[in-house]
Each structure stands twice: as structure tokens, then as C-alpha cells.
């Protein structure tokens, strides 16, 4: 989805293109704990979570996001060129990858047909998005979603994250913009963190066990946590929305597309626009449609 830039391809490219971040694991989580408590989370439960050794401050997500936003705003030359991103996506078009997606489609044909009947989203589109998002559910992210979102939420002050930025990234010209966007993204992450904690509690999941993408998207369909209560579907009717189980994740994906304008017998142009609502990258949308076309052949 749109916040993921947030998916594994760009995450891996970012990690290669950024300077080496100083390691950091210690943080004073008190402001975040107090904020969550003020928002009616159980203080004891929240403190117990943050006291666990698995909770570490990770500056990489906010660092990447600020770099992305500043470069876009001030049109700086970025090391991540469109050609590199397109080359990364091109691997989804390899014959062996398409063959694996075709096998997945056949194996899950009954579930996928149910999705098409309910939402008019072709099974090839569902499988194509799943392939690009998580390689058919095999790669769910290489970091904990809780640490990512908590670290971003704690980084509302630019000075918290400045030591982990390239020295020449924030200039006198861009500093006010950087401070504003840092606050905005921290507030956004805080909302996602609250949703993640609720999701974990409602589903009996250890919040620290949930893997996530660069910016905290979770599940085989890669939803940001706030989207689960809006678009999540309990397809297997077990009383919970489990985005790590195929029926729920795939139906939720289709429900998201339907809610953003997907209709039966849409033109390719309109399909493209709806897919952009799932992820704002044009290369992403191009790849999804190309893979879907190949799956029909």
C-alpha cells in the first residue's frame, strides 16, 4: 500500500544507497508511554512491552522517509534512479517467477474465484499484487513493525534523528520543511502504532513478533495497521482478521481495491488508477498489470 515504499524492493535499495547509520538501541520511551497511557492504553501493559529487551530504537525508517521527502521537495539527485527501481521490479517478470505465481493461482483457485465473485477483482490481479508485495507471502519484512513505528513515533523532533542523517541532507533552506515533516510523520506513525497494539491485543499476538516492512506494513497483503479495521475481512469466519492467513489477507486486499473504485469490466486505465491507490508508485502499478496479463496467457 501507499505508505510502504514500504515494500521489500525499495527497502533493500534504500539500505544499499544510504550511508551506514550509527547503531542505536537505547531510547527514553517515557514520552511515548505517557502518550499511549493518556490515550487509554493500560499503563502496566504498555510499560511491560517497552521494558522488554526486544524493543530497540531504530532510526532507519524515519531517516529514509526524511531523505525521500527532502529529495522530492527540493529535487535533489537521488541515488535511487527510476532505472534501478524498474530493474528491481523486472525480476517479477522472469519466466520462473511467473510460473511460481501461476502455480499459486491454481493451488488457490477456489479462494480466488470467491474473491472475484464478491469483489469483481480478477484472480490474476490479486496474485500479481501478492507477488509484488511479499513474493506470494514468503517475505513479510525484515524488521519488527513495533520497533519501526515506535521509533518513528518517538522521532517528532528533528534533533532526535539528525545524527542518523547524511550531514548535507538538511540544509538551511530545507530545515523548516524537515522539522515540519518529521513531526507529521511521527504523528502518523503514532496512529499506526496504536492500531498495531490494538490489532495484536485483539488477536492474541505478541506485538513484538509481528514482522513489518520499512515503514511498518504487515501481513502477506502488507496493510498499514490503521487499514485493518477499515478494510480487513474475516473471510474464514473465525472471529478475527488474520492478515497472515491467505483467506483473510486476500479478501482484505480485494476489499481495499473495491473500496477505492474497483468495478467489474474496468478498462486497463481505470485498473491502473485503482492499483495506484494501493501503492502510489507508477512502476509498481505497471508491474502489477504486466504480471496479471502474463498470468492470463
Tell where the protein language model's regions lie, with residue ranges.
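Cell-wall glycan-active module
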Residues: 1-216, 220-221, 226-297
